[in-house]
């Protein structure tokens, strides 16, 4: 047993807290970016999507690197790069002002979008390296109950969302509870957690990885990909990433007009997730991990469909958010536990492959798709009900999806969206005679996006049901010990 495993658990926990703080404050920055830089919902979604692209690539590459370079070196690299991403955010307003003077507002906005995009991308690279280290590390130092301790570890993510959400509610946007501060100050607060984390990692010793401990062949690390159930798990985790992280990216923005300060909904659901993840072990022992995933998917469907209805009561909004939180709480960490318990011979590779699929899906498709669905439905509402306002507010150019498709001459479809700065300014000005109509259109778009997203956990439920049937057919879900795993697993 690793003598300092509690300290290592805390260090691992703090990586997710830092990521959660950055994510929550960034998710609440949409109104500020729309007003200050004229960034529309679709572009905001693209930037938020960058917060998953680097994660998806580097959690998988990190899974390979950690096997051969060890936990400590990779974790130190991630913390340093994470601090650099905070610096990029901090200087964005200053650089935008300088660019506006030198090259004009249009190029200044374009350059600022690029700076924000690459800062968020670097943030996601670090998050990917964190996950590549901490998931197999916690699985290794707590082999007796991986589902329980991986869920506790991943309580750090909603814990960070709570801290970041409170910061956003108190200090971001016009609805700030205490005082509105510049958005870049709020967004860089995660650097405080990183300094504490850096001090812990420097002085602690870490255990060896699977590859460092013995003469393990590379082909053994990749043997999980020869298992059909594992390939199904990859698809399921991609859908989990789309649903959980895609909706989290948009939750604050989508509920902007439903409650006085929409960040409180994110804080509330994050608090529920934080609490629930400490009780995953006993629940998983009763249902088994696959059963827990199946039930969670069904609850997520109900929660999203409820949130997508026209709700007039704040209490009902929180009730629907409660159901959704119960649905999503156990999905991500329990999937990682299944990878660790069923494919121990693959070390960090199996867990990293699942994490990569989730992040790549939300990065390339999910976050932007939800934004596109919201923008499209908002514009359609005006076009069908208020033609004159639609003509007044519509953006001069159509938006292609996916935004990165233009680089490869690939565009699945185009939408007509509204001009972001004009839309946001009208919604913020209650004296504007068009404010109520634009808010109604925005709310309709938000509900439509949530309703369409509910199809994702529907597909997840079908997949987990098939896995339940499979494991029952082979005698039930069993944890595979590393010594016995050389013969392969299913």
Model regions: which residues?
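Extracytoplasmic
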Residues: 7-39, 135, 247-252, 366-367
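Extracytoplasmic gate region of multi-pass secondary transporters
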Residues: 26-30, 223-273, 363-373
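Central cavity-lining transmembrane alpha-helices of secondary-active solute carriers
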Residues: 49-64, 267-280
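C-terminal ends and interior cores of transmembrane alpha-helices
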Residues: 80-109, 299-312
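Low-complexity, proline/glycine-enriched hydrophobic segments characteristic of transmembrane helices
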Residues: 98-103, 368-454, 486-490
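Hydrophobic core of transmembrane alpha-helices in multi-pass small-molecule transporters
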Residues: 100-130, 316-330
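Helix-loop-helix hairpin linking two adjacent transmembrane segments in secondary transporters
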Residues: 144-145, 152-209
């Amino acid at each position: 047993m690793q003598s300092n495993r509690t300290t290592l658990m805390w260090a691992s926990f703090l990586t997710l807290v830092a990521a959660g703080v950055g994510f929550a404050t960034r998710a609440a920055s949409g109104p500020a970016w729309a007003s200050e830089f004229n960034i529309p919902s679709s572009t905001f979604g693209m930037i938020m999507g960058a917060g998953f692209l680097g994660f998806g690539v580097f959690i998988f590459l990190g899974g390979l690197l950690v096997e051969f370079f060890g936990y400590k070196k990779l974790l130190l690299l991630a913390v340093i790069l994470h601090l650099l991403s905070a610096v990029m955010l901090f200087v964005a307003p200053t650089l935008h002002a300088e660019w506006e003077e030198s090259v004009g507002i249009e190029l200044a906005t374009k350059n600022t979008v690029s700076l924000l995009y690459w800062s968020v991308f670097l943030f996601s690279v670090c998050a990917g390296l964190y996950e590549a280290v901490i998931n197999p590390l916690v699985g290794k130092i707590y082999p007796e109950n991986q589902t329980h301790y991986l869920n506790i570890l991943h309580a750090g993510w909603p814990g960070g969302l709570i801290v970041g959400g409170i910061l956003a509610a108190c200090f971001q946007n016009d609805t700030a509870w205490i005082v509105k501060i510049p958005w870049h100050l709020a967004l860089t607060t995660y650097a405080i957690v990183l300094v504490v984390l850096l001090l812990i990692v420097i002085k602690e010793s870490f255990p060896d990885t699977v590859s460092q401990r013995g003469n393990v062949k590379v082909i053994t690390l990749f043997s999980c990909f020869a298992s059909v159930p594992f390939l199904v798990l990859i698809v399921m985790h991609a859908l989990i990433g789309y649903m959980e992280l895609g909706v989290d990216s948009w939750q604050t923005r989508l509920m902007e007009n439903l409650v006085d300060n929409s960040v409180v909904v994110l804080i509330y659901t994050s608090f529920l997730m934080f609490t629930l993840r400490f009780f995953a072990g006993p629940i998983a022992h009763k249902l088994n991990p696959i059963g827990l995933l199946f039930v969670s998917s069904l609850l997520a469907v109900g929660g999203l469909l409820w949130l997508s209805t026209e709700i007039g009561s704040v209490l009902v909004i929180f009730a629907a958010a409660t159901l959704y939180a119960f649905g999503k709480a156990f999905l991500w960490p329990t999937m990682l536990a299944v990878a660790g318990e069923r494919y121990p011979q693959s070390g960090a590779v199996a867990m990293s492959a699942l994490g990569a699929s989730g992040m790549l899906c939300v990065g390339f498709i999910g976050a932007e798709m939800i934004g596109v669905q919201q923008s499209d439905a908002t514009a359609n509402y005006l076009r069908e009900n208020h033609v004159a306002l639609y003509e007044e507010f519509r953006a001069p150019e159509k938006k292609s999806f996916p935004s990165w498709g233009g680089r490869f001459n690939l565009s699945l479809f185009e939408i007509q969206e509204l001009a972001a700065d004009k839309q946001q300014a009208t919604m913020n000005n209650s004296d504007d005679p068009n404010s109520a109509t634009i808010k109604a259109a925005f709310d309709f778009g938000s509900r439509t996006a949530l309703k369409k997203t509910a199809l994702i956990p529907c597909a997840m439920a079908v997949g987990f049901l098939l896995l339940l049937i499979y494991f029952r057919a082979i005698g039930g879900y069993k944890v595979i010990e590393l010594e016995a795993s050389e013969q392969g697993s299913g």
